């Protein structure tokens, strides 16, 4: 059951902790809804302030009391009057001392007096429903919070300021203009005849704009969500040691027993400002062990969907049949051959053509790691390098743009075949509907649930 459906959204006053739980200097508690000021009057006291006539956007001092009149904490608080607030509703922010007991007692008091604990992302959801932001800006707020690199933060900030939203509005107005020309031709064809060539050129321009956005979307997505990288190789080649070396922490178990890693282990790192999500996978070999087979299957799936693979080889054994077996499985992927254990190897076998551009390292000592990082960056340069960006930062956004392009291409093809204008207008209207869903003009509760459930409770 979703308690946000129906009239509950407008009636309920919600409360939540907006800072991370735990011990800290200051904690922030948010209240939003039409009873925000009433709850403030019941719980916060300051003889010099009349809560009923509280000046908005001004920081005030006071004491927070529970429902029995017992003091909980000395606080500061700010009142934001509707609609000039984050949510578009009456809001109060309470700044209390950080600590689990203090914040819990304040929130418990507000709940007892009629507030409801906010759901994930409900403050931002209300901001959207009250017309303060569109869905793209709502997504950008979450991306700012989760940003792992300077580039991803900049993209998210650009979209919060309206970069992608403005481009979508341009597309929308262009399609409305084309639709108007078609409707004029249909309704007043005897008096006003808009040339089909003009309509066709307008649609081609829209499709070209969309094509560019979609073409460069991968770059925005990689910057926003991170570049994926997998370590593959035969058992006991040093994959877990390399993962720990790259992450500068012990995330994976390191032993001399082949096949120790059976599940995919993931970590995150930055190399010169580029955010990577790296996976350590099970050792790949021919085996009859059912459990190990499952791990190997997971390893291959993880590797093949990654942006770059580190193909780890053992410098002490040279290129083996097991290595050749793995090579044949990943040869069509973007991979970097990496010779490990150079600290204990006598020589490195670089005679094989596809290994001539390999990197030589010791995951144990750290030798060659700088060269490996440079090689990794070079292999994904096209995905993250500076240049044209589409500011498409989520798969949802990309999917909607592809749907719009599909409808515009249909309209263009129909126009070239001299199909009736009223048929062509259907495809254009479908494209407009997709743009409106992308921005949030049209939405379903399931769509909102999917987006805002990723937020923390206090946002």
UniProtKB/Swiss-Prot annotation:
Keywords: Cytoplasm, GTP-binding, Hydrolase, Magnesium, Metal-binding, Nucleotide-binding, Potassium, tRNA processing. InterPro entries: G_TrmE, GTP-bd, GTP-bd_TrmE_N, GTPase_MnmE, MnmE_dom2, MnmE_helical, P-loop_NTPase, Small_GTP-bd. Binds 1 potassium ion per subunit. Signal peptide: none annotated. Its EC number is 3.6.-.-. Mg(2+) binds at residues 240, 261. Its main location: cytoplasm. GO terms for cellular component: cytosol. Exhibits a very high intrinsic GTPase hydrolysis rate. Involved in the addition of a carboxymethylaminomethyl (cmnm) group at the wobble position (U34) of certain tRNAs, forming tRNA-cmnm(5)s(2)U34. This is tRNA modification GTPase MnmE. It is found in: Cytoplasm. GO terms for biological process: tRNA methylation; tRNA wobble uridine modification. Belongs to the TRAFAC class TrmE-Era-EngA-EngB-Septin-like GTPase superfamily. TrmE GTPase family. (6S)-5-formyl-5,6,7,8-tetrahydrofolate binds at residues 30, 93, 132, 459. Homodimer. Heterotetramer of two MnmE and two MnmG subunits.
